[in-house]
């Protein structure tokens, strides 16, 4: 399972400028370029899992050509991770 979290971590870093993740306890974690390394996702996986680990909610991030229509809507799930 640590490998899946590592894939999630790698993908967040590569694709997104700012991300918001919600845990099962309701805590909202914002990951951006400045604070990215302060969040230990592997530790979080054991103590307070993410609500929907396959989905990431992008806010003010870069959009691809497919997601152009969502440029002004920051509450869309625009990225889905493959199950591996």
Curated annotation (Swiss-Prot):
It is found in: Virion tegument; Virion membrane; Host cell membrane; Host Golgi apparatus membrane. A lipid is attached at residue 2 (N-myristoyl glycine). One of its GO terms (biological process) is anatomical structure morphogenesis. Myristoylation and palmitoylation (probably on one or more of the nearby cysteines at the N-terminus) enable membrane-binding and Golgi apparatus-specific targeting and are essential for efficient packaging. One of its GO terms (cellular component) is virion membrane. Residues 40-46 are annotated as: Asp/Glu-rich (acidic). Plays an important role in the cytoplasmic envelopment of tegument proteins and capsids during the assembly and egress processes. Also participates in viral entry at the fusion step probably by regulating the core fusion machinery. Belongs to the herpesviridae cytoplasmic envelopment protein 3 family. HAMAP family: HSV_CEP3_alphahv. Interacts with cytoplasmic envelopment protein 2; this interaction is essential for the proper localization of each protein to the assembly complex and thus for the production of infectious virus. This is Cytoplasmic envelopment protein 3.
């Amino acid at each position: 399972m640590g490998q899946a979290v590592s894939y999630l971590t790698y993908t967040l870093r590569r694709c997104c400028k700012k991300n918001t993740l919600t845990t099962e306890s309701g805590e909202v974690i914002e990951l951006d370029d400045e604070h990215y390394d302060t969040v230990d996702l592997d530790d979080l996986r054991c103590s307070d899992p993410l609500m929907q680990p396959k989905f990431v909610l992008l806010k003010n991030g870069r959009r691809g050509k497919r997601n152009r229509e969502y440029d002004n809507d920051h509450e869309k799930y625009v990225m889905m991770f493959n199950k591996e």
